[in-house]
């Protein structure tokens, strides 16, 4: 990559004498940046990219790479600036246009993001990635028919990119004789030539297709292959993950809470929706976001980020949860204030703003102390249904515990033990449990409980949640565009014969 980059940019240098530097020195910097970037060392890569640009600000590829690294570090606003520089230098640069769109989408500037994807298609009509990104945005905004069309166009241009088939599968069911299913089955007949990631997407998609066709045995065989392939690609420290949950139960006692109460930021704006993935959190947020005084902010790691900011200020920078032992009342208040400032950047006018980062169940004790007036809603669903749905999903990031049945069961058990602990040590009524099955059985009754818990007056628009136009970036993006349906309840039963390791781990908490 570095040699190709320099071949292009040094032609420009011949016309711009001020930019001439020894090629070898620039090549060394570029290679160092690319190595860091490829290894996921984004902060180090950014520093080198900035060095390069200080010498050669005319390199559009380096601006693009800088933007990519900034976005990977959770700095989409800075990434937007970098991509804008890349396009200023090279207007017909489809990859940078797509990356620009992704960063804009992360900032919820969706109209602008869509425009960048369409601009990328205009300058490169055969760029499958642009159609795929456009499809994902259309799916997130509920324009499912348009999303299908975009994914189909992407597949026509890149028929061997099985991640696109996976995206298409999320917005349409498969049927017998489906031409896309035929293509997938042909690829699965001899997957040995495919990279592991392509095989993984292929098997996740075939699992969905066979589930659509009620071929449970075939579906689960593909699901096992997909998860096995994914599990081999990731690092998951189970002892550390479960140990943190155990440490929270040990550390945050009744006495711990009592000694620190009354010192947080007083605001009722935040509404935390916590729980396991695939437990109904998106449905709860969609109901809330249909209320005129609520803004649904979706999943953002805001609480984790501000907790990290406070941690760095404490003597010795102790990690969570032990950092809570070293926090003063002022620290809890500062954490709550920092979080509130970040949250309200999403909406300055809403009376309530939801935070649907499911992993915030780890922070419930911290939330209570730092934001004592914030609502906390816990989404609960049948354990086996929750876990099977997670096992059936390929997550774009995180959720490393979901790719092995036994690990998933152990994680779920520890999560439920921690939630029971929060109920025990916090004041009665502090956490509202909302069971998915209860929402399905009587959506109005459940919705009224949710709205009341958030201190809002009832609004009938909450019952038409499937009509609410907003962005949903989770795996449930297509489902929440439909009215309530019941076919996800007890879905695990048709896979009971295959999920023994999961059921064995769940047995101690069987309901």
Regions found by a protein language model. Give the residues of each.
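TPR/Sel1-like alpha-solenoid repeat signature
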Residues: 29-32, 36, 48, 62-76, ...
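PAPS-dependent sulfotransferases, especially Golgi type II membrane carbohydrate sulfotransferases
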Residues: 150, 165-169, 181-193, 202-270, ...
């Amino acid at each position: 990559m570095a040699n190709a980059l320099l071949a292009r940019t040094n032609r420009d240098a011949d016309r711009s004498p001020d930019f001439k530097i020894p090629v070898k020195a620039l090549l060394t910097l570029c290679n160092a940046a690319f190595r860091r970037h490829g290894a996921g060392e984004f902060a180090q890569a950014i520093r080198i990219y900035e060095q390069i640009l200080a010498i050669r600000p005319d390199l559009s590829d380096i601006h693009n790479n800088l933007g990519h690294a900034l976005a990977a570090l959770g700095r989409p606003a800075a990434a937007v600036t970098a991509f804008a520089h890349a396009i200023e230098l090279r207007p017909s640069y489809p990859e940078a246009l797509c990356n620009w769109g992704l960063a804009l989408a992360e900032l919820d500037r969706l109209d602008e993001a869509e425009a960048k994807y369409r601009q990328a298609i205009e300058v490169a009509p055969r760029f499958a990635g642009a159609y795929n990104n456009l499809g994902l945005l259309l799916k997130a905004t509920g324009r499912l028919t348009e999303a299908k069309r975009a994914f189909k166009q992407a597949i026509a241009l890149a028929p061997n990119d099985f991640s696109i088939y996976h995206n298409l599968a999320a917005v349409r069911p498969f049927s017998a004789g489906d031409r896309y299913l035929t293509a997938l089955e042909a690829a699965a007949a001899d997957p040995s030539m495919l990279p592991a990631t392509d095989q993984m997407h292929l098997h996740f998609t075939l699992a969905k297709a066979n589930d659509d066709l009620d071929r449970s045995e075939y579906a689960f065989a593909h699901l096992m292959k997909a998860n096995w392939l994914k599990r081999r690609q990731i690092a998951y420290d189970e002892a550390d993950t479960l140990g943190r949950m155990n440490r929270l139960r040990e550390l945050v006692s009744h006495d711990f809470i009592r000694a620190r109460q009354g010192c947080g930021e007083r605001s009722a704006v935040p509404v935390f929706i916590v729980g396991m993935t695939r437990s109904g959190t998106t449905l709860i947020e969609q109901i809330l976001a249909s209320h005129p005084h609520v803004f649904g902010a979706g999943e953002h790691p805001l609480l984790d980020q501000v907790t990290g900011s406070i941690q760095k200020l404490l003597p010795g920078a102790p990690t969570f949860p032990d950092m809570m032992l070293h926090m003063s009342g002022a620290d809890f208040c500062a954490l709550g204030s920092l979080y509130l400032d970040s949250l309200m950047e999403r909406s300055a006018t809403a009376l309530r703003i939801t935070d649907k980062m499911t992993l915030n169940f780890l922070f419930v004790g911290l939330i209570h102390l730092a934001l004592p007036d914030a609502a906390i809603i816990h989404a609960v669903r049948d354990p086996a249904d929750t876990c099977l749905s997670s096992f059936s999903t390929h997550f774009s990031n995180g959720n490393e515990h979901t790719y092995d049945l036994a690990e998933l069961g152990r994680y779920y058990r520890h999560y439920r033990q921690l939630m029971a602990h929060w109920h025990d040590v916090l004041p009665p009524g502090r956490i509202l449990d909302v069971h998915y099955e209860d929402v399905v059985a009587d959506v109005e009754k459940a919705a009224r409980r949710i709205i009341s818990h958030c201190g809002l007056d009832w609004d009938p628009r909450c019952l038409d949640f499937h009509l609410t136009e907003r962005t949903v970036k989770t795996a449930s993006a297509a489902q929440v565009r439909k009215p309530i349906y019941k076919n996800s309840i007890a879905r695990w039963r048709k896979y009971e014969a295959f999920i023994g390791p999961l059921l064995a781990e769940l047995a101690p908490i069987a309901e």
